[in-house]
Amino acid sequence: MTRPYAPGYRIPTDLLLKAYASGVFPMAESASDPEVFWVRPETRGIIPLDGFHTPKSLRKTIRKSLFDIRFDFDFEATIDGCAEKREERRSTWINAPIREAYVQLHRMGHCHSVEAWREDQLVGGLYGVSLGRVFFGESMFSKETDASKICLVHLVERLKARGFALLDTQFTTEHLKRFGAVDVPRGKYEKMLAEALKGEAIFFP
């Protein structure tokens, strides 16, 4: 992992979009740390859209229609859900400057959420950045079993339907590998990124 730029306390949206187009993204050491640093990993996590796999057990859950899936219905609640500390996740990298920057990107039409609702309560979701034909997944959360996983399935369905070419997960986890996530070297990723930035795909509406 490299940090190509000096830390800062604010992220201008024009700089943030240029960073994503260059294969760079911001993080913070913790939610309480006011500084932001920039990351350009040696290997990058992606989910090939044509290789996405929905586990059999999850397909059964999806058929039960337990959740109302909404897009961009309450973006700020979704990013706050991702930032919330939980028993299984005691720390988070979403600090105040990051939240502010992504809320602004959402207002500009470059950041979107997929949300799972149940009885008018937000119980899971994810958000990410849309640029060109690329969707950069940022974070997800669940308050009910499988809520964020089902949001991921709906995300991929929308990306395919809307003509997206690349789903960037930044890093891979065992959880994401169950859905087909793979690591690619930085050089290969940046070529894929450059190609996918050609043209425009509309995530919402």
From Swiss-Prot:
<dbReference type="GO" id="GO:0005737">
    <property type="term" value="C:cytoplasm"/>
</dbReference>
<dbReference type="InterPro" id="IPR042203">
    <property type="entry name" value="Leu/Phe-tRNA_Trfase_C"/>
</dbReference>
<dbReference type="Pfam" id="PF03588">
    <property type="entry name" value="Leu_Phe_trans"/>
</dbReference>
<protein>
    <recommendedName>
        <fullName>Leucyl/phenylalanyl-tRNA--protein transferase</fullName>
        <ecNumber>2.3.2.6</ecNumber>
    </recommendedName>
</protein>
<dbReference type="GO" id="GO:0008914">
    <property type="term" value="F:leucyl-tRNA--protein transferase activity"/>
</dbReference>
<dbReference type="GO" id="GO:0030163">
    <property type="term" value="P:protein catabolic process"/>
</dbReference>
<keyword id="KW-0012">Acyltransferase</keyword>
<comment type="similarity">
    <text>Belongs to the L/F-transferase family.</text>
</comment>
<keyword id="KW-0963">Cytoplasm</keyword>
<keyword id="KW-0808">Transferase</keyword>
<dbReference type="InterPro" id="IPR004616">
    <property type="entry name" value="Leu/Phe-tRNA_Trfase"/>
</dbReference>
<comment type="function">
    <text>Functions in the N-end rule pathway of protein degradation where it conjugates Leu, Phe and, less efficiently, Met from aminoacyl-tRNAs to the N-termini of proteins containing an N-terminal arginine or lysine.</text>
</comment>
<dbReference type="InterPro" id="IPR016181">
    <property type="entry name" value="Acyl_CoA_acyltransferase"/>
</dbReference>
